[in-house]
Amino acid sequence: MNVVQGNIESKNAKVAIVVSRFNSFVVDSLLDGAVDTLKRFGQVADENITVVKVPGAVELPLAARRVAASGKFDGIIALGAVIRGGTPHFDFVAGECNKGLAQVALEFDIPVSFGVLTTDTIEQAIERSGTKAGNKGGEAALGLLEMVNVLQALEEQL
């Protein structure tokens, strides 16, 4: 049996992190977690990490698409925080963001790690950005590192 799986270390990986500025009090912690994970666990060098800041979660897919189209990166991490309010706006923003990022991954054959929090409350967002529920930015970075390696292994085997 042949099993293809990735590891986490990706010293030569070039990673773009596309970050929403909206809800920056949460998203800044997600970015810190992602960068820390890329450096400490992936051994990714500073010069191989590019951060792209956009206004909000709706803009993440377009920026990710432009990054992917450049062909200069091995993977993309999308970070943001969409917090439910009193209107259906949350559902549209969260859904379109998720759909758009998945489309980028499939269209450009590049891993796009979804680190966009979709929570009911501000407290839940804070918990997931580095307090008692961990840091989802760091988790998104781990997933990306593994997928970069999985795709490289598949390329070598197929």
From Swiss-Prot:
Kindly list the positions annotated as binding (2S)-2-hydroxy-3-oxobutyl phosphate.
G86, T87, R128
Q: Which domain of life is it from?
A: Bacteria
Q: Which Pfam families match?
A: DMRL_synthase
Q: Which GO terms describe its biological process?
A: riboflavin biosynthetic process
- So what family is this one in? Belongs to the DMRL synthase family.
Q: Which top EC class is named for this enzyme in its record? A: transferase
**Does the keyword Transferase feature in the UniProt annotation?**
yes
In which organism is this protein found?
Answer: Shewanella pealeana (strain ATCC 700345 / ANG-SQ1)
- Residue positions binding 5-amino-6-(D-ribitylamino)uracil: F22, A57, V58, E59, A81, V82, I83, F114
Q: Which GO terms describe its cellular component?
A: cytosol; riboflavin synthase complex
| Assembly mode | Forms an icosahedral capsid composed of 60 subunits, arranged as a dodecamer of pentamers.
List the active site: H89
Q: Which SUPFAM superfamilies match?
A: Lumazine synthase
Q: Which UniProt keywords apply?
A: Riboflavin biosynthesis, Transferase
Q: Which InterPro entries match?
A: LS (IPR034964), LS/RS (IPR002180), LS/RS_sf (IPR036467)
Q: Which GO terms describe its molecular function?
A: 6,7-dimethyl-8-ribityllumazine synthase activity
Functional summary from the UniProt entry: Catalyzes the formation of 6,7-dimethyl-8-ribityllumazine by condensation of 5-amino-6-(D-ribitylamino)uracil with 3,4-dihydroxy-2-butanone 4-phosphate. This is the penultimate step in the biosynthesis of riboflavin.
This chain belongs to which protein, by name? 6,7-dimethyl-8-ribityllumazine synthase
**PANTHER family per UniProt:** 6,7-DIMETHYL-8-RIBITYLLUMAZINE SYNTHASE, 6,7-DIMETHYL-8-RIBITYLLUMAZINE SYNTHASE DMRL SYNTHASE LUMAZINE SYNTHASE
| CDD domains, sorted | Lumazine_synthase-I
Reactions this protein catalyses: (2S)-2-hydroxy-3-oxobutyl phosphate + 5-amino-6-(D-ribitylamino)uracil = 6,7-dimethyl-8-(1-D-ribityl)lumazine + phosphate + 2 H2O + H(+)
Pathway involvement of the protein, from the record = Cofactor biosynthesis; riboflavin biosynthesis; riboflavin from 2-hydroxy-3-oxobutyl phosphate and 5-amino-6-(D-ribitylamino)uracil: step 1/2
Note whether DNA repair occurs among the keywords. no
Q: Which HAMAP family match?
A: Lumazine_synth
Gene3D superfamilies named in the record: Lumazine/riboflavin synthase (3.40.50.960)
E.C. code: 2.5.1.78
